[in-house]
Amino acid sequence: MRRSLWMVAIALGLIAAWSIGRVQAQGDKVTFADPNHVTFTAMPNAPKTGVTSATLWGDPNEGATGTYTKFAPGWDAGWHTHTADVWIVGIKGAYLYKDEAGEKRVGPGDFLRVPGGHKHWSGGDKKEGALFYTESSGKFDLVPAK
């Protein structure tokens, strides 16, 4: 019985390690990026004006990904959800966030995790907009809330 429990624990550990590696999809190469020296383009699966991104690793159309994202000053994403979990770290300006619990201003160095399916509003600071790093655990999407 004790040996079986150890085997189950080892199997679960291996599955967890594989899953984390798969979600991050970064392989074994070091990734370095400077937001001042990347090319920003229209963000896949998002409104075409006011938001741009630079993919650092992964593919936002296929699965897990890491990007630099910019919101124009005053940009409004409206109320929406994402299918996958999203992690955000502020770099410059402020990513504005709102949900039923209240409002947050995600500035340089601040961290925010938005679980997949969680209804929220987001936008850019009215004067500076926002530059932030985003990781998504799956294909990136922006689903307008009903």
Task: Show which residues each predicted segment covers.
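Positively charged n-region of N-terminal signal peptides that target proteins for export
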Residues: 1-4
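Short acidic-glycine-tyrosine-enriched beta hairpin
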Residues: 100-117
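Bacterial N-terminal signal peptides
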Residues: 8-17
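Short beta-strand His + acidic residue motifs that chelate non-heme Fe in jelly-roll/DSBH
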Residues: 77-79, 96-98, 119-126
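Ligand-binding loop in jelly-roll beta-barrel domains
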Residues: 116-140
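Conserved short histidine dyad/triad with adjacent acidic residue
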Residues: 62-82, 115-117
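A short, N-terminal "cap"/entry segment at the start of jelly-roll beta-barrel domains
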Residues: 16-18, 23-65, 146
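Glycine- and acidic-residue-biased ligand/ion/polar-headgroup-sensing regions
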Residues: 72-75, 82-100
